[in-house]
From Swiss-Prot:
Subunit: Homodimer.
Disulfide bonds: 31-46, 71-101
Listed name of the protein: Subtilisin inhibitor-like protein 15
Native source species: Streptomyces bikiniensis
Top-level taxonomy: Bacteria, Bacillati, Actinomycetota, Actinomycetes, Kitasatosporales
Pfam families for this protein: SSI
Length: 113
């Protein structure tokens, strides 16, 4: 094979990563050799993951929340996960947000999740 495989499952779930998380949505995404899977925007999502991958994790996907967008202060946790193979190596990444609004501002309207 001439390329390192990149194929992941992306999910959004209700709950905190320290407890039970109920999966609300999950998609598959393959980025090599060509973008595909069940993800609705595979090309954009692959580009976003490639740009957000650093130091063995995907923390680069997290932006500073938009200071002009106010989110309610209620705690209704949402957890995003990424599991699979990225550039030929097994990977697993997750992040919990205090609520869906905070998730939206921190992921900055990205395509991956």
């Amino acid at each position: 094979s001439l390329y390192a495989p990149s194929a992941v499952v992306l999910s959004i779930g209700k709950g905190d990563a320290s407890g039970p998380v109920t999966v609300l949505r999950a998609t598959t995404l393959s980025c090599a050799p060509v973008p595909g899977g069940t993800h609705p925007a595979p090309e954009a999502a692959c580009a976003e993951l490639k740009a957000g991958f650093a130091g063995g994790g995907f923390g680069g996907l997290l932006a500073s929340p938009d200071p002009d967008r106010a989110c309610p202060q209620h705690f209704d946790p949402v957890t995003v996960t990424l599991d699979g193979v990225w550039e030929g190596a097994r990977t697993s990444w997750q992040h919990t947000f205090s609520n869906a609004c905070v998730m939206g501002t921190t992921l900055d309207g990205g395509e991956a999740f």
